[in-house]
Amino acid sequence: MMEPFRIHKGTAAVLMNDNIDTDQIIPKQYLKRIERTGFGKFLFDEWRYDNNRQENPNFPLNAQERKGASILITGDNFGCGSSREHAPWALADYGFRVIIAGGFADIFYMNCMKNGMLPIVMDKDMREQLAKTDAREQITVDLENEIMTTNTHRFHFTIEKMWKEKLLNGLDEISITMQYEQEIKEYERKVALH
């Protein structure tokens, strides 16, 4: 079972590039493990670090005031490319709980949900307003009411009911299956009789 997602408060990091693919999120050389943890240090690896593994001071996530951000505001078509689940793992391990983009690749969107992160589709004007939020300002994301607020703005977002219920209740595929444990046992009993 995942941790339920109801209300999240956090600061934002801004990376308004379009078409950020899963290889840019987490390069393929780091995908040799199947654990879900330990990938955050490789997030946006080729952008965050120089050839000597020193932080690139020009990369937005390396700005001191953006460290510890748990909300990522980004461009269109985020998470395109291959369907590796390691990309959401890296984002979550880094500390992101909410990703706000103009759109997401379908599989990436579902993988975010399956890993307890909330991907929000928001138009460019609203994302640009959010991006102007002071780096230290808390943004509140209220999933139940589908509202996001800053000190000066209030934004409405929508999410498909099925995904919303899964996140609100912390339900992953295993915990959903376990809700039908009795029915599964009954089916197995009937099949065994034939």
Curated annotation (Swiss-Prot):
Cited Pfam families: Aconitase_C
Biological-process GO terms, alphabetical: L-leucine biosynthetic process
Sample GO molecular function, one term: 3-isopropylmalate dehydratase activity
Pathway the protein contributes to: Amino-acid biosynthesis; L-leucine biosynthesis; L-leucine from 3-methyl-2-oxobutanoate: step 2/4
Keywords, ordered alphabetically: Amino-acid biosynthesis, Branched-chain amino acid biosynthesis, Leucine biosynthesis, Lyase
Enzyme class, first EC level, given as a word: lyase
Catalytic activity entry: (2R,3S)-3-isopropylmalate = (2S)-2-isopropylmalate
Superkingdom field: Bacteria
Gene Ontology cellular component annotations, sorted alphabetically: 3-isopropylmalate dehydratase complex
E.C. number(s) listed in UniProt: 4.2.1.33
Subunit organization: Heterodimer of LeuC and LeuD.
Matching NCBIfam families: leuD, PRK01641.1
Its biological purpose: Catalyzes the isomerization between 2-isopropylmalate and 3-isopropylmalate, via the formation of 2-isopropylmaleate.
Protein's UniProt name: 3-isopropylmalate dehydratase small subunit
Protein species of origin: Bacillus cereus (strain ATCC 14579 / DSM 31 / CCUG 7414 / JCM 2152 / NBRC 15305 / NCIMB 9373 / NCTC 2599 / NRRL B-3711)
Encoding gene (name): leuD
